[in-house]
Amino acid sequence: MLKNLFRKTKYITVSQKNIENYKRENTPTIPDGMWVKCNKCGEILYQNDLEKNYMVCNLCGNHFRIGVKERIKYLFDKDTFKEWDYKIKTENPLDFKGYDEKIEHIKEKTNLSEAVTTGKCKIAGMEVVVCIMDSKFMMGSMGSVVGEKITRAIERAIGLRLPVIIFTASGGARMQEGILSLMQMAKVSSALAKLDEEGLLYICVLTDPTTGGVTASFAMLGDIILAEPDALIGFAGKRVIEQTINEKLPEDFQKSEFLLEHGFIDKIVPRSDLRKVLAKLINMHQNSF
């Protein structure tokens, strides 16, 4: 009996490689991109359901940032969008180090030519000129090409006697182009002044984020200014302002709800209602075109 008590215990050696193989074989395979975490409430959302709901969380109403393709799909009549000026090439006028390489990398990554896409389309059968900014392209920053494309679109709208809708999503002027990027603020604003003189409608839809030079120029010049819920809209950053004035700002400062309350915008429109609201506004102003 004592002999059996001190006998060496038998065991099986399992290598780390065998454990990894077991885990790999017994772990369910889930394709990438099927599930998305809401950055507001933390809920895990099924990608297909999220897309059907206009990229809006069905629990907390958080509006995910969307790009050009999604806006065209959700808002405009099918197969009516005709893009303009997509061949305009971004230059490096200041020979800013690494700028050319960065632009080419972002072009490949996003499949976009620049931070704004312009063109003509139809909403509920009515023709409009649209400019759609995309924050995925260098945070939607406004450089020479962005200003030129928006200006050309406005000038064409004047010639065609069509209303203009601009969807803003930008971090402001593009620092790599220096004063040339800041000049676009005046350039686009001047084109919008001509549009106004012609009695044509300009609707601006502010989306998250709309900041810097874009906010300080054409984003706030709309005849009608709409915004998506909970969108960040401002000029300088909240912390910069707090440090400058030595005061604590409200929690919802620079949010679309705060701007509506203080009279800076006309209406907050959920993404699911935006097509209907835009169609109604354009239809109301048809006689002025």
UniProtKB/Swiss-Prot annotation:
It is an enzyme of class 2 (transferase). Pfam families: Carboxyl_trans, Zn_ribbon_ACC. The keyword Transferase applies. A zinc finger (C4-type) spans 38-60. It catalyses: N(6)-carboxybiotinyl-L-lysyl-[protein] + acetyl-CoA = N(6)-biotinyl-L-lysyl-[protein] + malonyl-CoA. Its cofactor is Zn(2+). It is found in: Cytoplasm. It comes from the Bacteria. Its main location: cytoplasm. Its EC number is 2.1.3.15. GO terms for molecular function: acetyl-CoA carboxylase activity; ATP binding; carboxyl- or carbamoyltransferase activity; zinc ion binding. Component of the acetyl coenzyme A carboxylase (ACC) complex. Biotin carboxylase (BC) catalyzes the carboxylation of biotin on its carrier protein (BCCP) and then the CO(2) group is transferred by the transcarboxylase to acetyl-CoA to form malonyl-CoA. Belongs to the AccD/PCCB family. PANTHER family: ACETYL-COENZYME A CARBOXYLASE CARBOXYL TRANSFERASE SUBUNIT BETA, CHLOROPLASTIC. This is Acetyl-coenzyme A carboxylase carboxyl transferase subunit beta. It comes from Clostridium botulinum (strain Hall / ATCC 3502 / NCTC 13319 / Type A). The gene is accD.
